[in-house]
Amino acid sequence: MEKSIKLVAFDMDGTVLDSKLRLPKGLFEMIESHPNVKFVVASGRQYYSLLNIFNPIKDKLIFISENGGIIMEKDKVIHIMPVPDAKALEVLDLVSEDKGIYPVLGCEKTSYICLLYTSPSPRDRSVS
């Protein structure tokens, strides 16, 4: 019985991307030449960051983004794991102590970079 590969998953930073953040030559062609194999991009990056890189072949990929927080296939949400508001506020409280940290709140359709997150009490701000 011949065994065949059914799924290939790969990380981006430090794995598929080289030191200049370039994809390997021929990667898109290789993916397109294996229609019976599912290819999964797994990354801590935001979904739309990955989509910008893989847009020409996006419909041939499954995206696990936000460190597993959002899984997308063919522009549809397969799975989403939201962070409860109380936990998000707890994290924002913690990182607000370091003025050199700018948290990114990843959402299904966009991400928010908290550049102005400087109030004395992060709880004064709404997560929604």
Segments from the language model and where they lie:
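Single conserved hydrophobic/aromatic residue that forms the stacking wall/gate
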Residues: 117-128
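Conserved residues at the C-terminal ends of beta-strands
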Residues: 11, 66, 128
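Active-site phosphate-binding/coordination module
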Residues: 23-116
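Short, small/polar residue-rich loop motifs at catalytic or cofactor-binding pockets
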Residues: 2-4
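Asp-based phosphoryl-transfer active-site loop
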Residues: 6-19
